[in-house]
Amino acid sequence: MAMVVSAWRDPQEELAAVDDQSAAGREHLQHRHSPKSAEEKAQIAAQNQQHVECVVCGDKSSGKHYGQFTCEGCKSFFKRSVRRNLSYTCRANRNCPVDQHHRNQCQYCRLKKCLKVGMRREAVQRGRMPPNQPNPSHYALTNGDHLNGQCYLSGYISLLLRAEPYPASRYGNQCMQSGNIMGIENICELAARLLFSAVEWARNIPFFPDLQITDQVSLLRLTWSELFVLNAAQSSMPLHVAPLLAAAGLHASPMSADRVVAFMDHIRFFQEQVEKLKALQVDSAEYSCAKAIVLFTSDACGLSDIPHIEGLQEKSQCALEEYVRSQYPNQPTRFGKLLLRLPALRMVSSSVIEQLFFVRLVGKTPIETLIRDMLLSGSSFNWPYMPIQ
């Protein structure tokens, strides 16, 4: 599934790329005309900089931003807070811990610490922009913003795509060979990767990391199975019935005839949703937008800011619509067909997906519990499988 990417570049990313190339050129010239001792000093300095911690949360710093060494997360949080002139409220005593594991729990205390350690508001306001470039706040991703700019939409989609930890083309060629029936272990391995990919993707897309941690948990606990189905379709996951039943352990714990019939119906429905998505030949950008539409749902229980979540879903839907209109002008019904496929994903039984793919991996531990633990830990979950090379 190919995607035309040349027309979908974030202008700010292009500017950054030009700056990076210029910097690389300067560094190359310096290396050519400097003595070896200078090269060694530069290497030592670079190694030391790699270990600089974010002064806000203690995570690994990506460089100096707005006057202080910070990670990408705190840099983005501070920039958004200042540019939108946001005000937050602390639900505790205005002294919440702000570290790598708790930085998303209280935005008030996080911004307070950003300012306390010396991050400068004025550095955000005068952030560099190319000549004749509209103010980035014009494309600020806030409720009630301007949604008509292609730059805004292409930038949003680019960030969704960049958040993918495992591109579909790298899901293991040994598992994707047509005509070969996957073994039980391969099925469980691929399923673990698909679920891991969904959670890691969510943690790295715009806006989701800035939500209250309780909202993050609620959204993923409700939608993980829908994201799994989308990833299964995108990766062309083979869904042969026999190994699926074996992976589910039905032979070890026999079911009654009625339960077997119901279980098979759920499997067939799951297979149908995957096949219908594959038949539409959905490309990577469309899958990313579809996953964002699914993830940002106001149907999750206990959300702290439902209008904000609804706004994020609307943005994702607008981005998908504009992308389809631009990339598939000869398919006027394509956007509608894609959108109509999403409600059925909610009807795929999450308990059946657990039984089919994860009971051998995690036993009786609910997937929702694993997702919660992964988000609360703030670090990658250690699946018992090697990462894709």
From Swiss-Prot:
GO MF term list: nuclear receptor activity; RNA polymerase II cis-regulatory region sequence-specific DNA binding; zinc ion binding
Role description: Putative transcription factor that is required in photoreceptor cells precursors during eye development.
Subcellular location: Nucleus
InterPro entries assigned: NHR-like_dom_sf, Nucl_hrmn_rcpt_lig-bd, Nuclear_hormone_rcpt_NR2, Nuclear_hrmn_rcpt, Znf_hrmn_rcpt, Znf_NHR/GATA
DNA-binding region: 51-126
Chain segments carrying region Disordered: 19-39
PROSITE patterns: NR_LBD, NUCLEAR_REC_DBD_1, NUCLEAR_REC_DBD_2
The protein, known as: Nuclear receptor subfamily 2 group F member 1-B
Zinc fingers, NR C4-type class: 54-74, 90-109
Main location: nucleus
Keywords: DNA-binding, Metal-binding, Nucleus, Receptor, Transcription, Transcription regulation, Zinc, Zinc-finger
Highest taxon, organism lineage: Eukaryota
Similarity comment: Belongs to the nuclear hormone receptor family. NR2 subfamily.
Annotated NR LBD domain residues: 152-378
Gene Ontology biological process terms, A to Z: angioblast cell migration; brain segmentation; cell differentiation; cranial skeletal system development; negative regulation of transcription by RNA polymerase II; nervous system development; vasculature development; venous blood vessel development
PANTHER family the UniProt entry points to: NUCLEAR HORMONE RECEPTOR (PTHR24083)
This protein's record includes keyword Amino-acid biosynthesis: no
Encoding gene per record: nr2f1b
A Pfam family matched in the record: zf-C4
Tissues and organs where the protein is expressed, per its UniProt entry: Expressed the retina, where expression is restricted to the outer nuclear layer.
